[in-house]
Amino acid sequence: LSDANQTRLKLSQKQFKRLLALVQYAMAQQDIRYYLNGLLLVVKGNEICVVATDGHRLAYARETLAEQLPSIEVILPRKTVIELSRQLQENDDALEISLTPTQAQFRFGAIEFVSKLIDGKFPDYDRVIPKTHDKLVKLSRQTLLQSLQRAKILTNEKTPGVRLVFSNGSLKIIGNNTEREEAQEEIEIGFSGETIDIGFNVNYLLDILNNVTTEEIECHLGDASSSA
C-alpha cells in the first residue's frame, strides 16, 4: 500500500477476531444497496469500531487502541470479513492493519491479506442507536438464549416472530404459528413499570446471544413501538 493517506494500527488477533464476531452476522448478503454487503470499520482517536447492518438490525462494537490515530472510515467487503474471521487466531499475537481510502492490508503470522474496499456511503449508524431509552433490564444470556430456542420451535419458518412481554418482575416469551400452536415461558427479571409488549424476529435475537460471551446482557427499552 502507498504511504499516502494511510492509517496504521496494531492490536491482537484475538481482539479483532472478537470485534468481527460481534457484528458480522448483521451484514447484508445480496442487497442492491451494495455498501450494506460489508462491514464499516472506523478508526477515530484511540478507538476502533465496527458496524454492520442489513437494514433491519444494526450491530456495533468497539475497542480501545493503545495510541491516538488519524480518523478514517472504510467499508470491508463481506467476503473479506468472513475470510479474516476464519484466518485470525484466538491469541495475543499481533495484527497490523493498514488502511487507505481504497485498500486495506492485514498482516498477521505468515499471512499478508490485501483487500479492495467498497466505495459507498454507509448509513449514519449513530442516529439509529437509541439514546433515550430509560428502562434497563439485565438478563442471563444463557437463560434467555435457551428460552428463545424453545420458543422458536413453534414459530413460522418464513416469519419467525416472538413476543417479549416485560412486566413487573417477569419476562414472558411467546412463540406461535398459523396453526394456532403457542409456546410460552416466563423468566424472573428485575423490571418494574408499565408492561411493554414487543415483537422480534427470533433469529435476530439468537444471532446476538450466540455471538456475545458475557454471562449477563443489558436490554435498554423505550416503549412497545420503539427499537431496543
Where are these regions (language model features)?
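Structural preference for solvent-exposed beta-strand-turn elements
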Residues: 1-228
